[in-house]
Structures are given as structure tokens and as C-alpha cells.
């Protein structure tokens, strides 16, 4: 079967500058900002400034901005925490969701963005809040409505000697959307190895960790801010600098076993039923080992990437071989899955055995494999964690897959992970199935109903 090569569109895309200047900022409909809320935000920033003035290890400040709800990009901080040549949004180092009560007591999902800023940015924000607090207290009776704010004339604003009209309204907008400022800390005791992502600061990761008595080598650093730590190191970091931790997950994964395969070895007595491959597209597979004795072995280019000193058992070949068999000749084993796409060649990288393994080590291998095989655009990954993903943030594994896909223009087909038969309730997917850019798949029957072992997410 002869196929045309993949076409790549190349060119330069240009966008004409918008000749229209942005208009005067406005408050949302029916919004009311009370002086008490402005005062509380100011006091919170004052406490944060005091904390970071004493704790100088990160050469700046981490400030978590808790919003009242999920906010659009245009409704994030507009002026507070900005500083010369930097918009407020430029300093965002992390984002997460929390479930908390709203003003009516109903539990809703809210945004939290963590900023890394110089202390001068906090000082500036405090001064702006102080000015706006005074104006609202003295000239608007302690609260200002959307109608009053939007009637302000930028030319005749009476307080231009203190603050411009536009900046006055920008501060009010920030106050309307922001619930509070805080310094968020991770506080838990761990007993296993962890993959930790810390917030990016202006200090090299190894140098920063050494300030807290943690010394690591380069092979425990994934992308500059994602690191592998042992239990005592994790607990030490939590105790001394819990504010640094953006994401963390147990560094232990295992196969996301496809129940349809039942871990049976692929039959090898079907010789000569497949033509030799020609120029069919290649799919990359990152899994356990591949059995080169199977009938479709001509279609698979196998690379064994586990250490030669690790003994392999027959079980170490079952899952990986079965996955590649589906890609090469899937409908032969299950005619109901015939999609008319024909056969695909596979470049198979055996990175694991059937037992549990280090996610961190596999992630390092995945980046190396993808970067060295740029001709492959579609990758299959059936390795995942048996533990559920965090409710409020993406996993370090999922984030790394997203980075790899963005950097190398590839897509991963990732197993949604399966729950054990002993699990009766619904169970969320496991990392890295929370990757945003990946195509995550799970099992359904021919009526479209989820299988008993299917997990849910995110």
C-alpha cells in the first residue's frame, strides 16, 4: 500500500495592528465595591509584604491571588501586582482550582493564580489600594457602584492628583474579582518518593533547594523546576518552604492494563497473513517490551531501553506486544474495531517491565525518545498511575507531556487508566491522563456505555 508523505504547511503568518485604542475600563454590571473589602485586601498584602521582607530566600515574593469564581483572562489582575515593564499577568507562575463557598454559601469552583513579584510590586499595590480606599470612603459613602464608577469622566476626575481615573477604575475592577491575597503552603507528611514541581523564581533550582538543606544532582531535575525528591527531602521542603510547591505526585506508576487484552500473549502462528510493510505511517509506542517472534514483527521496529542487568520475564512482553498488535493489525483480533484505515508501522520503545516503575525516569526517557524521533507525530502511551489525579491542579507528568507535545508538535494517545476490580466507586483517572494536549482514551462497550473498570475525569 503506497501512501503520500505527510504534508507540512509552512509560512509566515502576520497580523495587522489594531488601530483602535482600548477604551476606558469599566466595572461589571451591578457590581458594588465596599471600602471594607478594599481595606481587607490592603491588609492582606501588608502581611504578605511583612512575611517576604523577613524570608528572603527566593529574592522576591510568591503571592496567591484567590478569585471569587472562575475568571476569564480579561478579568485577571489588571493593575495590582504590576510593576515597571511588567503586566500583572506576566508574573503568573502557577494556576489551580479550589472548591469553596461563594457569598451565598454555595460551594463553587474558583481560580487561584500564584504570582512571583518583587517586593516593590506589593508596595505599589498597597499604595494604590490605600488611595482608592480613601476616595471611596470619603467621596462615595463607603461603597461605589458600577453606575457611579462608569460615569467618571477621565478629564474632570477630581482626584487626578492622587490617581488617574483609569487606574482608579482598574483598581476597583481588581477588587471586584479578587476574593483575597494569600501565601499558599503545602502541608502534608509523605512517606514515598515524589515528583515535585516548584514555582519558578529568579534562582537556579539546585541553588534554591540548597538554601533549605536539600542537595540534588542534575539527573533528578526534569525541566528546571520539576524534581524528584526522597521522602525526607519532601518533608524538609514542606516544613521549611511549603510555599514553593506547585504540584506533587507519588513517583510510582504501573501499567494501565487494557482489560480487553487480558494480558494474553499475541498468537505467533499467523505467519504470512500480512504483507511486508512499505511506506505506511509510523506510530510510536512507549510501553513494556516487544516480543519479536510474533507474526507481525516485520511491522515493528523494536528498541529495548531497559538496563541489560534487569532480568526480563515473559510477562514483561505481554502488554507492550499486545498494544503494538492493535496498532498494526487490530481488527484481526476484534473485527468490530475495523475502521478502514489499514495497517500502521510501529516504532516500539520498551522502557519498562510489568512491575511498578519510576514515573520520573520514564518521563526523562519520553522526552529523549520524542526528540530523537522527529519523524513520528503520533505516540501511544499506556503507562499510568493507579492513584487518582489531584482535584485542583494538573500532575507534573501531565504537564511534562503537554510541554513535549508543544515543543515537538506531536500528539500522545494516552490510556485513561483503569480501576482495580476491588474498587467499587467511581475513580478519577491517574496521571498522566490529565494531560491537556493529549488524546485520552478509555473503554466502552459497543453500546457506548463505560466498562466496569473505566475511570472518570478530570
Where are these regions (language model features)?
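Extracellular S/T/G-rich loop segment that most often corresponds to the catalytic His/Ser-adjacent loop
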Residues: 281, 289, 295, 430-458
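A generic structural motif
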Residues: 103-124, 196-199, 220-233
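Catalytic-core regions built around general acid/base machinery
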Residues: 396-409, 431
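Protease zymogen maturation seam
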Residues: 163-194, 206-282
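Loop/turn-to-beta-strand initiation segments
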Residues: 343-345, 409-413
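Subtilisin-like peptidase catalytic core
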Residues: 23-42, 46-50, 55, 72, ...
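Acidic-leg catalytic submotif of subtilisin-like serine proteases
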Residues: 268-309
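Active-site neighborhood of phospho(di)ester-bond hydrolases with catalytic His/Asp-centered motifs
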Residues: 287, 380-382, 412-419, 441-442
Amino acid at each position: 500500500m503506497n501512501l503520500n508523505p505527510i504534508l507540512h504547511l509552512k509560512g509566515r503568518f502576520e497580523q495587522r495592528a489594531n488601530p483602535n485604542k482600548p477604551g476606558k475600563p469599566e466595572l461589571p454590571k451591578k457590581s458594588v465595591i465596599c471600602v471594607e473589602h478594599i481595606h481587607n485586601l490592603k491588609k492582606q498584602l501588608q502581611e504578605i509584604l511583612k512575611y517576604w521582607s523577613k524570608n528572603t530566600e527566593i529574592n522576591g515574593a510568591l503571592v496567591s491571588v484567590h478569585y471569587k469564581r472562575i475568571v476569564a483572562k480579561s478579568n485577571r489582575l489588571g493593575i495590582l501586582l504590576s510593576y515597571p515593564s511588567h503586566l500583572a499577568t506576566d508574573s503568573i507562575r502557577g494556576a489551580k482550582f479550589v472548591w469553596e463557598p461563594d457569598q451565598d454559601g454555595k460551594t463553587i469552583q474558583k481560580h487561584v493564580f500564584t504570582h512571583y513579584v518583587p517586593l516593590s510590586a506589593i508596595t505599589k499595590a498597597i499604595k494604590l489600594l490605600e488611595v482608592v480606599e480613601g476616595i471611596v470612603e470619603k467621596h462615595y459613602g463607603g461603597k461605589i457602584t458600577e453606575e457611579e464608577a462608569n460615569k467618571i469622566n477621565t478629564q474632570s476626575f477630581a482626584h487626578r492628583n492622587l490617581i488617574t481615573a483609569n487606574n482608579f477604575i482598574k483598581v476597583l475592577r481588581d477588587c471586584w474579582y479578587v476574593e483575597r491575597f494569600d501565601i499558599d503552603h503545602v502541608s502534608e507528611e509523605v512517606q514515598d518518593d515524589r515528583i515535585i514541581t516548584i514555582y519558578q523564581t529568579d534562582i537556579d533550582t539546585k541553588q534554591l533547594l540548597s538554601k533549605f538543606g536539600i542537595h540534588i544532582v542534575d539527573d533528578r531535575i526534569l525541566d528546571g523546576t520539576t524534581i524528584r525528591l526522597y521522602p525526607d527531602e519532601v518533608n524538609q521542603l514542606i516544613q521549611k518552604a511549603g510555599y514553593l510547591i506547585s504540584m506533587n505526585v507519588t513517583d510510582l506508576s504501573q501499567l494501565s492494563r487494557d482489560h480487553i487484552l487480558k494480558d494474553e500473549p499475541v498468537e505467533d502462528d499467523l505467519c504470512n497473513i500480512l504483507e511486508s510493510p512499505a511506506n505506511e505511517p509510523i506510530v510510536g509506542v512507549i510501553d513494556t517490551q516487544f516480543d519479536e517472534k510474533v507474526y507481525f514483527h516485520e511491522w515493528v521496529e523494536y528498541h529495548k531501553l531497559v538496563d541489560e542487568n534487569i532480568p526480563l520475564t515473559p510477562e514483561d512482553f505481554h502488554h507492550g506486544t499486545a498494544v503494538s498488535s492493535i496498532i498494526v493489525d487490530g481488527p484481526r483480533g476484534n473485527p468490530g474495531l475495523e475502521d478502514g484505515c489499514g495497517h500502521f508501522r510501529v516504532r516500539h520503545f520498551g522502557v519498562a517491565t510489568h512491575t511498578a516503575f519510576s514515573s520520573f525516569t520514564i518521563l526523562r526517557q519520553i522526552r529523549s525518545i520524542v526528540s530523537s524521533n522527529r519523524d513520528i507525530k503520533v505516540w501511544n502511551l499506556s503507562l499510568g498511575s493507579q492513584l487518582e489525579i489531584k482535584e485542583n491542579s494538573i500532575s507534573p507528568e501531565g504537564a511534562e507531556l503537554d510541554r513535549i507535545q508543544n515543543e515537538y508538535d506531536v500528539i500522545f494517545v494516552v490510556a485513561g487508566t483503569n480501576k482495580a476490580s476491588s474498587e467499587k466507586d467511581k475513580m478519577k483517572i491517574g496521571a498522566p491522563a490529565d494531560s491537556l494536549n493529549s488524546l485520552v482514551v478509555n473503554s466502552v462497550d459497543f453500546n457506548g456505555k463505560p466498562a466496569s473498570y473505566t475511570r472518570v475525569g478530570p
